[in-house]
């Protein structure tokens, strides 16, 4: 929760059963404008229930597994909500898009508008452990794989 508040969140909700109810209780049963769901299968239904009518659910990950295919009428049932599944390939498919978007990210970092919260660092030789920690949700923020150790030696 601390990381979320430090990043500017007004309110933090822990995902799981009852998440949509917590969200709606917090904002007078209106739902939220946008839900960014990086968990996937385990949270998708709650994400649909937490968003306001005509709101957007952006499904950008599948940490708990892929979301099952859905009937489009489900979006209507929840108030004509919009569902998107953005991917880097779709946003960089046209010539020059990757460079333009990469340049925008670098500029945002240089301007201080985009910051990284590196919470763990692993030598490259421990990449499998880093991957396990990600899968087991033992990490928050960003992790770094080091190609060289502090002495400049390659791992």
Positions of predicted regions on the chain:
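Adenosine-nucleotide cofactor-binding segment
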Residues: 1-43
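Short catalytic-loop micro-motif centered on adjacent basic/acidic residues
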Residues: 33-36, 56-59, 116-119
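Residues in well-ordered alpha-helical elements
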Residues: 20, 45, 73, 125-128
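C-terminal capping/lid region of NAD(P)-dependent oxidoreductase domains
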Residues: 29, 113-120, 128-155
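Glycine-rich phosphate-binding loop and adjacent beta-alpha segment
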Residues: 42-113, 147-155
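Terminal peptide-recognition signature
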Residues: 4, 35, 47, 105, ...
């Amino acid at each position: 929760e601390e990381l979320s508040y430090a990043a500017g969140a007004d309110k933090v909700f822990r995902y799981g059963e009852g998440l949509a109810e917590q969200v709606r209780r917090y904002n007078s049963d209106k739902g939220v404008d946008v839900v960014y769901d990086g968990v996937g299968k385990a949270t998708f239904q709650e994400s649909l229930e937490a968003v306001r009518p005509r709101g957007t659910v952006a499904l950008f990950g599948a940490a708990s597994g892929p979301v099952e295919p859905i009937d489009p009428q489900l979006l209507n049932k929840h108030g004509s909500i919009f569902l998107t599944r953005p991917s880097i390939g779709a946003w960089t498919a046209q010539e020059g898009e990757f460079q333009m978007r990469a340049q925008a990210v670098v500029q945002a970092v240089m301007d201080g508008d985009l910051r990284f919260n590196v919470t763990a660092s692993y030598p490259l030789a421990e990449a499998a452990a880093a991957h396990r920690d990600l899968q087991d949700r033992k990490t928050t923020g960003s992790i770094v794989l080091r190609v060289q150790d502090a002495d400049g030696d390659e791992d």
